[in-house]
Swiss-Prot record:
Organism: Streptomyces coelicolor (strain ATCC BAA-471 / A3(2) / M145)
Pathway where it operates: Nitrogen metabolism; (S)-allantoin degradation; allantoate from (S)-allantoin: step 1/1
Identification of the protein by name: Allantoinase
Pfam families named among the record's database cross-references: Amidohydro_1
Alphabetical UniProt keywords: Hydrolase, Metal-binding, Purine metabolism, Zinc
Similarity-based family: Belongs to the metallo-dependent hydrolases superfamily. Allantoinase family.
Molecular-function GO term, any one: allantoinase activity
EC numbers: 3.5.2.5
Complex formation: Homotetramer.
Processing and modification events after translation: Carboxylation allows a single lysine to coordinate two zinc ions.
Binding positions (Zn(2+) 2): 150, 186, 238
């Protein structure tokens, strides 16, 4: 074994070549070698033997609403990154809303970076925002290091982040395409939403009818057409409607540069199980029926959907009323995303390698961090999650690190206990004990 400061050893290490018994050598913050399990440990190196627990690359979550500054009663960098670390996530990319100010100018980005600097327990990057009136700010934000730009095609739910109409979408895409940036889009069509029945109240079936599939499908079709027009890179956020999958496949075949994500809640929860009045299950677009979920899983398997991210979007408990029309829409999932996905994947005969591909490898590639994140390979950051995949636990909201311990998974039994999480060669959480914040702020490569 070459010189190393740390050797992390397991009978099951997930590498790009597959799962095998291995000794992972780490020097400083980087992986220097992935060697045979019984390779000799160099003098002076610290051996951490985790037995048959699985060592996987730290997850990369590219869709997180930290809400800091401005709405820290909802979340914040300290609590969000602790929750992420507890769940095996070592990198997150923060959405430009629901913070105040939103990340829509270089000055606002600077404010957010200053707030995050000493609070991040994991590595953190930032998305910019595309608004009707900030086209002039997009290139400066790109040059300042944001990973891309988020836009809404329907109202966002917060006044400081208005949505784009079709003309504004075209202007933003033209500008972003000029420097080959990435536009990530909440795709629901406002006209279809306005035409849908808006009964309100506690019945989930009424809420589901108010966010119909055709609102997603129409908005995605609009986005794909504009992406083709400008040869722009676009990414569909939190896909819920399986009806849009053929549109996406056809666009790709036609050369449109589009990637797609979905979320654990769409893959693990179903409309049929949502109790009336239980707005901890509310998100937009909504959790849909079991048959729709099956098609999302098929799309993950065949590659139509690229990756899985949390869309962690918490609020204070008082905003989660029993009226689905007025309750805040968002699911807090950072700490539970890995066990929730692993539980569902194993139930469908899929492996941890699949989960790693969707939640680490491909998310790192989405934001251009795949040269250093998303894989256990020489030259990559020494980011690891150590998982006991066959151990189970029952979700207790009191055990969550989120600022507001509201969860749609309360009382569920999940497979996969995160035993420890490592960031750039240092163990940052083990058995619920955290180090001081060690996270770095990341720029687009």
């Amino acid at each position: 074994m070459s010189e190393a400061e740390l050797v992390l050893r397991s009978t099951r290490v997930i590498t790009p070549e597959g799962t095998r018994a291995a000794s992972v050598a780490v020097t400083g913050e980087k992986i220097t070698a992935v060697l045979p399990y019984d390779a000799p440990v160099p003098a002076g190196a610290r051996l951490e033997d985790v037995g048959d627990h699985v060592v996987l690359p730290g997850l990369v979550d590219t869709h997180v609403h930290v809400n800091d500054p401005g709405r820290t009663e909802w979340e914040g960098f300290w609590t969000a990154t602790r929750a992420a670390a507890a769940g095996g996530i070592t990198t997150l990319v923060d959405m430009p809303l629901n913070s105040i100010p939103p990340t829509t100018t270089v000055d606002n980005l600077r404010t957010k970076r200053e707030v995050a600097a000493d609070k991040a327990h994991i590595d953190v990057g930032f998305w910019g925002g595309a608004l009707p009136d900030n086209v002039k700010d997009l290139r400066p934000l790109h040059e300042a290091g944001v990973f891309g730009f988020k836009a809404f095609l329907s109202p966002s739910g917060v006044d400081e982040f208005p949505h784009l109409d079709q003309e504004q979408l075209a202007r933003s895409l033209a500008e972003i395409a000029a420097f080959d940036g990435l536009l990530i889009v909440h795709a629901e069509d406002p006209h279809h939403l306005a035409a849908a029945p808006q009964q309100g109240g506690p019945k989930y079936t009424h809420f589901l009818a108010s966010r119909p599939r055709d609102a997603e499908d129409t908005a995605i079709a609009t986005l794909l057409a504009q992406a083709k027009r400008f040869n722009a890179r676009v990414h569909v956020l939190h896909l819920s409607s399986s009806d849009a999958l053929p549109l996406i496949a056809e666009a790709r075949a036609d050369g449109v540069r589009v990637t797609v994500e979905t979320c654990p809640h769409y893959l693990t929860l179903t409309a049929e199980e949502v109790p009336d009045g239980a707005s901890e299950f509310k998100c937009c677009p909504p959790i849909r029926e079991a048959a729709n979920q099956d098609l999302l899983w098929q799309a993950l398997a065949d590659g139509t959907i690229d990756c899985v991210v949390t869309d962690h979007s918490p609020s204070t408990a008082d905003l989660k009323t029993d009226d689905f029309a007025t309750a805040w829409g968002g699911i807090a999932g950072l700490q539970l995303s890995l066990p929730a996905m692993w539980t569902a994947a194993r139930g469908r005969g899929l492996g941890l390698e699949d989960v790693v591909r969707w939640m680490s490898e491909r998310t790192a590639a989405l934001v251009g961090l795949d040269a250093r994140k998303g894989a256990i390979a020489p030259g990559h950051d020494a980011d690891f999650a150590v998982l006991a995949p066959d151990e189970t636990f029952t979700v207790d909201p009191a055990a969550l690190q989120h600022r507001n311990r509201v969860t749609a998974y309360a009382g569920k039994t999940l497979y996969g206990v995160v035993k420890s999480t490592w960031l750039r060669g240092e163990r940052i959480v083990a058995d619920g004990a955290f180090t001081d914040p060690k996270g770095q702020l990341l720029d687009r490569a």
